[in-house]
Every structure is written in structure tokens, then in C-alpha cells.
């Protein structure tokens, strides 16, 4: 690590702390030549392994761009898309692997998108899973319906009560 003040390569770590919920490491350093202190932040680089064999750095923006297309015309805000992108990145980082297959990125998107908007989920899933017929859509919709939490509607009973006697009005 080069000192930002004198460019000396001999620096010493004074303190290391995990930051951003484990997404980065913050290190406090000192230079042995000029004795100045500085802070560095180290991020784990996520790499996506494409089906073609090529690899590229993971970018939250690219993941959100694909979801944005599925959400077109739906009541989904940019803030919600940003939160979804963060959730996807957090899920991928939680695994701890530096290289992630593109397939895993798609799987990480499906869960949060399903909770956000079912129609957008179906649109994204139809491309991601390469739906070939209406039957594929019907199967996915049936699965969505089956996994929805059952809402139990219980009849409300109101106990019969006698009207309360009128209360005297205080004048004064």
C-alpha cells in the first residue's frame, strides 16, 4: 500500500474493522516514513461468470436494468428497484464466493422481485426461465397462487346488547 502523502510503500495497519455489513473492510494505516495516518477501504470484487465462459464485474445497475424492463408500466418506484438491487447484491455477497455464475444472479433476483410485484416477477421469470408456451405461464401462476399465504376470513359476530340508559347532563 502506497502512502498517499509521500508515496512510500512501507505502511503499517493500526486497526481493521468490518464495514457496510461485511461488504468492506476499513483499515487505519500509518506510514513508516512520514508518520502520517490514512484510511483505506477494501471491497470484495464480485465477478459474474457468464454462460459463454467470459467473466465480468458484478454491477448492481446492470441487475436492476433487467428488472426495470420487467417492471415497465407497473407501480414500482426507483427506490424500490434500488432496494431490490441492494438485496440481490447482499445475497450474493453473503454466499462468500468471489465468482458467481450468472444463473445465481438470476435466482437472487427472483425472490425479492416476487415479493415486490408478481406481474413483474412473471415477466422476468418468463425470460429468465425461457418460457415456451402459455402452459409455462399457467404453471408459474399456479405455483404463485399455491404459495400465497392463506387469508382466513372468520365471520365477525357482534354480541347483542341492550341500549345504555341515557346519562344525566350536568348543567352548571
From Swiss-Prot:
Residue ranges spanning the membrane: these are none
Is DNA-binding tagged as a keyword? yes
Query: What's an example Gene Ontology biological process for this entry?
Result: negative regulation of DNA-templated transcription
Cofactor(s) in the UniProt record: Zn(2+)
Q: Does the keyword Zinc-finger apply?
A: yes
Classify the source by domain of life: Bacteria
The record's cofactor note says: Binds 1 zinc ion.
Gene Ontology terms, MF aspect: ATP binding; DNA binding; zinc ion binding
* Segments forming unnamed zinc fingers: 3-34
**PROSITE patterns associated with the record:** ATP_CONE
Please provide the record's keywords in A-Z order.
ATP-binding, DNA-binding, Metal-binding, Nucleotide-binding, Repressor, Transcription, Transcription regulation, Zinc, Zinc-finger
What positions does the domain ATP-cone occupy?
46-136
What Pfam families does the record tag this protein with?
A: ATP-cone, Zn_ribbon_NrdR
Detail the disulphide connectivity of this chain as listed in its UniProt entry: none
- Provide the function of this protein: Negatively regulates transcription of bacterial ribonucleotide reductase nrd genes and operons by binding to NrdR-boxes.
Task: Write out the similarity annotation.
Answer: Belongs to the NrdR family.
Question: What's the name of the protein?
Answer: Transcriptional repressor NrdR
Q: Which organism is it from?
A: Nocardioides sp. (strain ATCC BAA-499 / JS614)
